[in-house]
Amino acid sequence: NISNYFLGIVSANEGYTDDAYNYFKKVQSLKNRHSKFNIEFVRTLVLLEKFDHAFAFSKKVWTEDELFFEADLLLGLDSFIKKDYEKAEKYFERLNKISRYNFFFEDFIGNVLIAWSKASQGNKEDSLKFIEKVPNTYHHLTQTQSCFLKCYFNSEDTKKSFEKLIQNKDYNFSRYNFFLINYLTF
């Protein structure tokens, strides 16, 4: 019933997530025919913190030949949580492809997540390489991620890296004093 779909969209846009979910449940047959439905339904599930349902639904609708940011992100995170890093990286790499259509995230989210996947596998060199792949547009964020990776690996230059970050005159990184202090006290 098309009215349930539209009522679900309106409810989601108005912030009535429970109502949106109830309407979307009634039109599950759209999942194989309408990608916008899949996006809205996954977002609704996440907002309702129905993560297991969101993971399961994403697996059902995911295909190799269709880029679906929300599904790739969720399936990548699910694989990461389960320590299946190779599979997680497959999904995270797709985020870089998807982000080419959205210049705000181009090569950002996927590379940062892959860097942390590499870090979780103990691969310091590759994790830092993936952070370096992030476009210069995000240099403030890559600086912080680089510091956190160095902290994660307990690198010798971690303290120096945090100090350089905090002393940056172009941007106020003073809130990272907290991380430096915690790093130094442990």
What are the language-model segments listed below?
Residues 14, 48, 82, 121, ...:
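Structural motif corresponding to the intra-repeat A-B loop/turn of tetratricopeptide repeats
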Residues 21-25, 51-64, 86-99, 123-136, ...:
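Alpha-helical repeat scaffolds
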Residues 10, 44, 78, 117, ...:
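Residue-level signature for tetratricopeptide repeat
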